[in-house]
Amino acid sequence: QDVPIAITAVTEQLQDATIRNIADLSAFAPNVIIGETSVRARGSAITLRGINSSESDKSLDPKILVELDGVAIGTNSGQIIENFDLERIEILRGPQGTLFGKNTNGGVIRVMRSRPTGEFGGKVEMTIGDNGQEEFRALINTPIVEDILALKVFGTTIKNDGHIYNTFLKVDGPKKDYTNYGATFLFTPNDKFEALLTIEQYDDGSDVGAWTNEND
């Protein structure tokens, strides 16, 4: 059964526009504002059709769901993940509870990364700038068992010293120190079955703003 949904899909523009995370999407979709909160590591502040989801307390459910490779990220924290291998992003505006369950009053943002290709190859990107800006991104694809098991290894590290001088503490800030790395396995023993497994970790030691509990 066909279900009418207001959807914006971004594909070819991802690499051309250097889109690395969902916060870079605001210029590519109508009625969408996406930013990063200052009180949660990689926390998102998303507005779709006037409905805002920027809860800083992890005990509060977001009103807009973010999916990464089909897996829901249950809180706003960690939703602004830096990715080097984005393949497609879909923005579904309006309530999506029938198809996606809870936390979808405002809509759903689906982020899909590239799958292992089964062929050997890769890409590397480096950026160096002012204020100690250092960015390194890498991705490698390789077959393990030809036409059956493929592997993709990826990693990102971003560091900078910040661009604001704190006259009280006598230091620059806010500093950024972010690392994300992992591996994805694609198992296709035949034409009727496939299994995709991703193992990854990300660490964010970046400076964040002051925080107070909204329930106090």
Q: Where in the sequence are the language-model features?
A:
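Transmembrane beta-barrel architecture of outer-membrane proteins
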Residues: 17, 43, 63, 106, ...
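Extracytoplasmic beta-strand/coil segments of soluble accessory domains associated
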Residues: 23, 27-71
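Short acidic/polar hinge/loop motifs at secondary-structure boundaries
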Residues: 56-57, 63-64, 69-95, 112
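Surface-exposed loop/turn segments flanking beta-strands in extracellular/periplasmic regions
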Residues: 215-216
